[in-house]
């Protein structure tokens, strides 16, 4: 009888793999959104920089203001899209979790 008591231990409750697939944790969703927002802002800023340099060289005799203006437009657009992603469940570029 003592052998049966030792072998029969209560089952440990472990989360199944299916529950991890269906229900994502809040931190995972937030991390995914931050990754999208930061990469989006980096891409928009780089594109603004490129357009600013191109415009500066082509039209403005290599002055600095088109570059800064392009960077400003890129950061502003990235911020606006990031704000839309965080405010709504389906932003301009939503994260699929």
From Swiss-Prot:
Residues 1-26 are annotated as: Disordered. The chain crosses the membrane at residues 36-58. Residues 1-35 are mitochondrial matrix. It is found in: Mitochondrion inner membrane. It holds the Pfam family DUF543. It is a single-pass membrane protein. Its main location: mitochondrion. Residues 59-97 are mitochondrial intermembrane. It comes from the Eukaryota. Disruption phenotype: Partially altered shape of the mitochondrial network with condensed, fragmented mitochondria accumulating at the periphery of cells. 60-70% of mitochondria exhibit an increased inner membrane surface and stacks of lamellar cristae disconnected from the inner boundary membrane. GO terms for biological process: cristae formation; membrane organization. One of its GO terms (cellular component) is mitochondrial crista junction. Keywords: Membrane, Mitochondrion, Mitochondrion inner membrane, Transmembrane, Transmembrane helix. InterPro entries: Mic10. Component of the MICOS complex, a large protein complex of the mitochondrial inner membrane that plays crucial roles in the maintenance of crista junctions, inner membrane architecture, and formation of contact sites to the outer membrane. Belongs to the MICOS complex subunit Mic10 family. Component of the mitochondrial contact site and cristae organizing system (MICOS) complex, composed of at least MIC10, MIC12, MIC19, MIC26, MIC27 and MIC60. This complex was also known under the names MINOS or MitOS complex. Interacts with OM45 and POR1. This is MICOS complex subunit MIC10.
